[in-house]
Amino acid sequence: MTTAPSPPPAVTSARILRLWWPLAASWLLMGAELLLFTVFVARMPDPEVNLAAYGSIVFPISLVIEAPIIMFLAMSTALVADGDAYAKLHRMMLKAGVLLTVVHVLVAFTPLYDLVAGRVLKVPVEVMEPARIGLRIMTPWTFAIAYRRFHQGILIRFEESRAVVVGTAVRLVANVAVLSVGFAVGGIAGIVVGTCAVATAVVVEAVYVGWRVQPVLRERVRPAPVHGAPLTRSAFLSFYVPLAMTPLMMLVIQPIGAGAMSRMPNALASLAAWPAVHGFVFILRSVGMAFNEVVVTLIGEPGAVRALRRFCFAATAVVTGLILLVAFTPLSAFWFGTVSGLAPELASVACTALLFAVLMPGYTFLQSWYQGALVHSRRTRAVTEAVAIYGVVAVSLLTLGARWQAHTGIYFAITTFTIGGILQTAWLWWRSRGPMRALGPDSDSVPAAEVAWNGTSPAE
């Protein structure tokens, strides 16, 4: 005699918090990695050039190359419900990781680098060679990210999110270990020590996550019956291609922003201060980014919409209050001058730049709320539309700023990103109204991955 499976527990604020906090902690630790880079490299020889090399070339180019696989986490969270889906998507992950690693090698080890960094981005000449070395060291980054995010999504889907934060803690320990050894040895360029730490840490985390997910695959994924129609290539592409275009378009703006700052007044200071400012803002934005997977996982369950909305708005108020507290008090000078170790002139630039970023953490939570509803409802094209709006606005304003030559680059760039982000959030809200109405405040819809696949997206 078989018994019906017990229904999932009600979606309450406590359940949302239990799923969200490990993911938020994981994102916070990733943000700490960016700050650690700044803290250590700022205390090594020639910090301004090495920080600029990482902030203007190494980090943004590495992100652009890996952009097509960034959404593997959301993909596996939504789609890996059984062994058949896992096998097909695992093969896709391996192929994408290898292909993008080849792209990274071509950019870092061939004359393509001179074209991208010198002719396209026009970064200061003193930054070119340190950044070339750093980009080469980052070669393992892309495949490790693909492997890690794919398996993290499976852990999140099956509510094993604490394993995700443990993996990120392992990554942070590896990062600190390499940075500490490099700093203690001395005489090694900051860009070399920093990128060795970042590359080593992400590989170590990928190995841990791959080991930790094995019991979930063995006991819960592979034995599970196929949900709905089998996952087909056309169904997958209709779901994932718009989703993958989202970070690609978003991250292409990063090197464009670096290129624009290189053409604006106070270029080297802007590029050198950028990693510290971006790292701090990323910490507060990261907890909002973690909310996206929570929404995708829970929004189809009864009562989820009301509970998730309430949680989102409360969290938005908290993170906005925190960044306002830092930006408009002496805490910003303490952070950038004492903690980050920036020289006084760079710390001053960073403190002023933070004032232009105060809306970013709040609208990141809102973006995750609206975007999660769209991903659950398979309306991923709307997510791409929102990012396209962001991209058009950002590129247009950055081009104007580079020609205008009236403001310090980092101030103009952050203002541009904020304006684009607000418009992106507004579009996500507009396009998510239909899915939100369909789900309703007390939705009894089935989880997203149980929707039958027919090779097409829902009506837009």
Set out the residue ranges of the language-model regions.
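Short alpha-helical transmembrane segments in multi-pass integral membrane proteins
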Residues: 2-23, 77-141, 181-241, 299-359, ...
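Transmembrane helix-bundle signature of multi-pass secondary active exporters and lipid flippases
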Residues: 24-74, 241-297, 322-323, 357-364
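Hydrophobic/aromatic residues within transmembrane alpha-helices of membrane transport systems
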Residues: 25, 37-41, 54, 76, ...
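Hydrophobic/aromatic residues in alpha-helical transmembrane segments
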Residues: 37, 72-76, 113, 151, ...
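Alpha-helical transmembrane segments and their helix-entry boundary regions
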Residues: 51-52, 89, 152-153, 161-165, ...
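Small-residue-rich hydrophobic transmembrane alpha-helices
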Residues: 53-104, 148-152, 156, 273-323, ...
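Residue-level recognition of pore/gate-forming positions within transmembrane alpha-helices
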Residues: 59, 171-175, 198-206, 279-282, ...
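Alpha-helical transmembrane segments of multi-pass membrane transporters/permeases
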Residues: 154-180, 192, 301-316, 373-399
